[in-house]
């Protein structure tokens, strides 16, 4: 089975084929997800909440992301592996270069950064030096205290236009993928149609090129707050691999996300 690359995902977008992504943090789960056909695995800073028990993602370090990236890398053969760059690990282009290099050396195929216009120089410099970038707009969890909580972004015309403009600028700067989180489906549609690169949604409706969820939500093992955009597939299937297959199938046929998982 051929490895998934950014070119693979671009081809999927051009063909109108929906693809799936999940977070993963260890070799065993990563191997199961990879074996069932998940296209993209993300070592997310969400590990700060679902593994470490923090209230947000801010305490996570680059060393911790690198550790889990090495674990996941050992478990996969096909999936594209993205590593999150944690809070304040890319405040300057120079800092971003150092930390992104560490994550690539740990086994990542790409790094993910949260932010808009202020990141353009960093995205360009990383890309020019051979480090592929996945950008992240909308609800960016590392900015949770700026937003005043985990809230839907881009509902008013001004902010929607800003997010759309930032998406275009990040693509022009060299980003190869874009994640949009917790934005209205209409805005996600506009972004997906405006960009050549693939767009991955989470809480952004069904029109993006791909979908991503946190594995703990898919398997129904999250504690505390359960996001509206998530779905417990283990509850309906009773087995982990079957849950992953159900997620892949529902994304492919357009039944997930449905209106109950979508914001307006």
UniProtKB/Swiss-Prot annotation:
EC number: 2.1.2.11
Cofactor: Mg(2+)
Cytoplasm keyword on record: yes
Active site (UniProt): 181 (proton acceptor)
Catalysed transformations (reactions): 3-methyl-2-oxobutanoate + (6R)-5,10-methylene-5,6,7,8-tetrahydrofolate + H2O = 2-dehydropantoate + (6S)-5,6,7,8-tetrahydrofolate
Pathway assigned to this chain's UniProt record: Cofactor biosynthesis; (R)-pantothenate biosynthesis; (R)-pantoate from 3-methyl-2-oxobutanoate: step 1/2
Enzyme kind, highest EC tier: transferase
Keywords: Cytoplasm, Magnesium, Metal-binding, Pantothenate biosynthesis, Transferase
Cellular component aspect of the GO annotation: cytoplasm
Subcellular location: Cytoplasm
Pfam families (alphabetical): Pantoate_transf (PF02548)
Binding site for Mg(2+): 45, 84, 114
One Gene Ontology MF term: magnesium ion binding
InterPro entries, A to Z: Pantoate_hydroxy_MeTrfase (IPR003700), Pyrv/PenolPyrv_kinase-like_dom (IPR015813), Pyrv_kinase-like_dom_sf (IPR040442)
PANTHER family: 3-METHYL-2-OXOBUTANOATE HYDROXYMETHYLTRANSFERASE
Name of the protein in question: 3-methyl-2-oxobutanoate hydroxymethyltransferase
Biological classification of the source: Bacteria, Pseudomonadati, Pseudomonadota, Gammaproteobacteria, Alteromonadales
Gene: panB
């Amino acid at each position: 089975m051929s490895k998934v690359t950014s070119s693979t995902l671009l081809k999927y977008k051009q063909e109108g084929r929906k693809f799936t992504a999940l977070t993963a943090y260890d070799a065993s789960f990563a191997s199961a997800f990879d074996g069932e056909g998940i296209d993209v695995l993300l070592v997310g800073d969400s590990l700060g909440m679902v593994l470490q028990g923090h209230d947000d993602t801010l305490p996570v370090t680059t060393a911790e992301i690198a550790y889990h990236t090495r674990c996941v890398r050992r478990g996969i053969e096909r999936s594209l592996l993205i590593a999150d760059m944690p809070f304040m690990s890319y405040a300057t282009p120079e800092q971003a270069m150092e930390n992104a290099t560490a994550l690539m050396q740990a086994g990542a195929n790409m790094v993910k950064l949260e932010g808009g216009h202020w990141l353009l120089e960093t995205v360009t410099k990383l890309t020019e030096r051979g480090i592929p970038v996945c950008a992240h707009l909308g609800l960016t969890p590392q900015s949770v205290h700026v937003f005043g909580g985990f809230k839907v972004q881009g509902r008013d015309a001004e902010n929607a236009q800003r997010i759309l403009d930032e998406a275009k600028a990040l693509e022009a700067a060299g980003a190869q993928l874009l994640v949009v989180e917790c934005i209205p489906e209409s805005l996600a549609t506009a972004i997906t149609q405006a960009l050549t690169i693939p767009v991955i949604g989470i809480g952004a409706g069904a029109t993006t090129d791909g979908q991503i969820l946190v594995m703990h939500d898919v398997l129904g093992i999250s504690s505390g707050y359960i996001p509206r955009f998530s779905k417990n597939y283990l509850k309906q299937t009773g087995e982990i691999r079957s849950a992953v297959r159900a997620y892949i199938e529902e994304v492919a046929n357009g039944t997930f996300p449905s209106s109950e998982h979508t914001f307006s």
